[in-house]
Amino acid sequence: MLIGVISDTHIPDRASEIPEAVFDAFRDVELILHAGDLTSPDILTELETLAPVECVQGNMDRHYGIETPRSRLFEIESFRVGLIHGEVYPRGDTQQLRYLGLELGADVLISGHTHQPFIRELEDMVLLNPGSPTVPRLTDPSVMVLRIDGEKLDAEIIRTGAPVCRSLNFRR
């Protein structure tokens, strides 16, 4: 199964639209998982033109009255895939995310919130974060594509926009 993973779209509060590169990256997916901070349910309608969408509530979604579950668990082939927004502090703390995944009974946990993509393989769980395609934090805009085939899982971070500035030399 091919799955598109996205988070932290923040449309329309911080960005005006989903980049076309997201639609290109998700062209052949069978399912889209959104890890929260939609800030408008309209994003779901747009993504549903590609594939069915499942989502969870992000911290900003509560401010906009978007009522979706705070966590979900999906049985996809031989994997139990958890979906959360991932509001842990410090942001992206793998130990806290692991505990949340264990509470869900997940062997794969997808989260967002950091606006920074990562793939972490722990002893008993894989932690995935697609980053943000619209408002990345000190990294390139991105989404993720998962391929689950029986007992095999492949995850790929896909850049969806221009790279951010990595260095600057400034002189007066």
Swiss-Prot record:
Residues binding a divalent metal cation 2, per UniProt: 37, 59, 85, 113
Q: Which InterPro entries match?
A: Calcineurin-like_PHP_lpxH, Metallo-depent_PP-like, MPP_YfcE, PdiEstase_YfcE_CS, Phosphodiesterase_MJ0936/Vps29
Q: Which UniProt keywords apply?
A: Hydrolase, Metal-binding
The record's remark on the cofactor is:
Binds 2 divalent metal ions per subunit.
Annotated signal sequence is none
What are the names of the required cofactors?
A: a divalent metal cation
Which Enzyme Commission number(s) are listed? 3.1.4.-
Is Phosphoprotein found in the keyword set?
A: no
Q: At which positions is a divalent metal cation 1 bound? A: 8, 10, 37, 115
The Gene Ontology terms for molecular function here are: hydrolase activity; metal ion binding
Family membership, please give it. Answer: Belongs to the metallophosphoesterase superfamily. YfcE family.
Q: What is this protein called?
A: Probable metallophosphoesterase MTH_1774
Q: Which organism is it from?
A: Methanothermobacter thermautotrophicus (strain ATCC 29096 / DSM 1053 / JCM 10044 / NBRC 100330 / Delta H) (Methanobacterium thermoautotrophicum)
